Amino acid sequence: MAAKIKSGDLVKVIRGKDRGKEGTVKQVLSNDRLIVEGVQIVKKHVRATQQGQQAGIVSTEAPIHRSNVMVIDPETKQPTRVGITVKEEARDGKVKTVRVRVAKKSGKELA
């Protein structure tokens, strides 16, 4: 299945303690989880290392499941589902089929 949420997408959290927050996807992990900027902040206790890092409590983003976020439609600025359409493009004199992500609400292509 093609990836419907990619790094750099603007998403809105629809479930959980951070419901309603928006952020950009920093990283997509292999187990259907995402790291979203400014969402799911947790405090992590860190030991001092020999390289000079101090011990203490560090705030960092934890992964959130992809079912708990929706991509924001760039045209309507509202959360939307993502669909995939197949279109043909001419590249180097050859016609190739390309899968494109499309916002369901507006029908516009997502970057």
From Swiss-Prot:
UniProt cross-references to SMART domains, sorted A to Z: KOW
SUPFAM superfamilies assigned to the protein according to its UniProt record, in alphabetical order: Translation proteins SH3-like domain (SSF50104)
A cellular component annotation (GO) from this entry: ribosome
GO biological process per UniProt: translation
Tagged with keyword rRNA-binding: yes
A GO molecular-function annotation: structural constituent of ribosome
Keyword list, A-Z: Ribonucleoprotein, Ribosomal protein, RNA-binding, rRNA-binding
Pfam families reported in the protein's UniProt record: KOW, ribosomal_L24
InterPro entries hit by this protein: KOW, Rib_uL2_dom2, Ribosomal_uL24, Ribosomal_uL24_CS, Ribosomal_uL24_KOW, Translation_prot_SH3-like_sf
Domain of life: Bacteria
Described function: One of two assembly initiator proteins, it binds directly to the 5'-end of the 23S rRNA, where it nucleates assembly of the 50S subunit.
NCBIfam families: rplX_bact
Entry similarity comment: Belongs to the universal ribosomal protein uL24 family.
Assembly mode: Part of the 50S ribosomal subunit.
Name of the protein in its database record: Large ribosomal subunit protein uL24
Organism: Bifidobacterium longum (strain NCC 2705)
Lineage: Bacteria, Bacillati, Actinomycetota, Actinomycetes, Bifidobacteriales
